[in-house]
Amino acid sequence: MNLIPTVIEQTSRGERAYDIYSRLLKDRIILLGSAIDDNVANSIVAQLLFLQAEDPDKDISLYINSPGGSITAGMAIYDTMQIIKPKVQTICIGMAASMGAFLLAAGEPGKRFALPNAEVMIHQPLGGAQGQATEIEIAAKRILFLREKLNGILSERTGQPLEVIARDTDRDNFMTAERAKEYGLIDHIMHRSTDNK
């Protein structure tokens, strides 16, 4: 069972109760704390669009603790991050793996962070296929296409040559926060909350 904490604020009109995620959203903070599927992506995209409508000139913070997930769902979040006007600061807490790492790198350059003990993992897209030979061939071509697309974007976001990205994503590649910074997936290691201002 997933218990969602409630916070209570005192206002001039009395008390107001929020679930913790709504309270964080009020401060322009979004938490991606699960595997990425269509439902999670729809929720994150809706929050990004809402915050843009609220104030298109104020930054948004996206905290990431995710094992990754669906490529298409992750790309929905990525594309939205790129088209909205507010800058999206990304912060890795715990682990940003696979599509989680991709979204971490997709943050506004100069505003991509990891906590000191966070880990980042990159790898090539995963996929399975079954059925007739032609269906398996179609699925394999799609995975290869997605790998090229994701590697190209990671190369742009990190400054690493495409060949290096292709080599380093061939297998699970785990990185400390320090290594992720050297690699270009993040810009800073956050030591105090004032670092993200």
Swiss-Prot record:
Which EC class is this protein assigned?
A: hydrolase
Which residue positions are annotated as catalytic? 98 (nucleophile), 123
Gene Ontology biological-process entries: protein quality control for misfolded or incompletely synthesized proteins
The places in or outside the cell where this protein is found are: Cytoplasm
> What is the annotated quaternary arrangement, including any partners?
Fourteen ClpP subunits assemble into 2 heptameric rings which stack back to back to give a disk-like structure with a central cavity, resembling the structure of eukaryotic proteasomes.
Instruction: Report keywords, A-Z.
Output: Cytoplasm, Hydrolase, Protease, Serine protease
- Report the protein name in the record: ATP-dependent Clp protease proteolytic subunit
